[in-house]
Regions:
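Active-site neighborhoods and metal-handling regions in enzymes and metal-associated proteins
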Residues: 1-183
Length: 183
């Protein structure tokens, strides 16, 4: 797989897109609580994107062999690993939910962020999973440098996860961003 090396303008475009995606997460964070549905969160995210002049990369996205994705974001509750579809089931205390936001700026840059939320008091196992996942993410980020390979990132994350009694999901290994959703 080849990676397109971005120039300064491209990096600035990606940073702005990711900042805007993070802004969506910041705006919806106070609403992620018991009794709220992920469909309500999805609708709110669409309003935030419209107000900031971005649009969702996920709504209508159709990978080969699948129907178009219906949500403006992905909401993965509890056992759902990723790409959960927003639904009308209310969140409850003890749930964990990952919200994945991908925006497209008017200039065509994609920004992709996700954030994990603990709904009320969660189990010790859920809290541990969230904390170790966060630490694994930063360990992966620390591997990014000129000359490093994508495999270095994955290896560091996998070694860390397995060293703490967890595993990685081999079917989903991440993707790049730029002017294409899954660059």
């Amino acid at each position: 797989m080849s990676i397109t090396i971005k120039d300064a303008a491209g990096i600035a475009g990606m940073r702005e897109a990711c900042r805007l995606a993070s802004e969506v997460l910041d705006a919806i964070t106070p609403h992620i609580k018991p009794g709220v549905t992920t469909l309500e969160i999805d609708r709110l995210s669409a309003q935030v994107m419209a107000a900031q002049g971005t649009r969702s990369a996920t709504v209508g996205y159709q990978p080969p062999g699948y129907p178009p994705y219906p949500g403006h974001l992905c909401t993965s509750v509890n056992h759902v690993v990723c790409h959960g579809i927003p639904a009308d089931k209310p969140l409850k205390k003890g749930d964990i939910v990952n919200v994945d936001v991908t925006v497209i700026t008017p200039e065509g840059w994609y920004g992709d962020n996700s954030r994990m939320f603990e709904i009320g008091e969660v189990s010790i196992a859920a809290r541990r999973l969230c904390a170790l996942t966060f630490d694994a993410m930063w360990l992966g980020i620390e591997q990014v440098r000129p000359g490093a390979r994508l495999g270095d990132i994955g290896h560091a994350i996998q070694k860390f996860a397995e060293g703490h009694g967890f595993s990685i999901v081999r079917e989903f290994c991440g993707h790049g961003i730029g002017k294409v959703f899954h660059e």
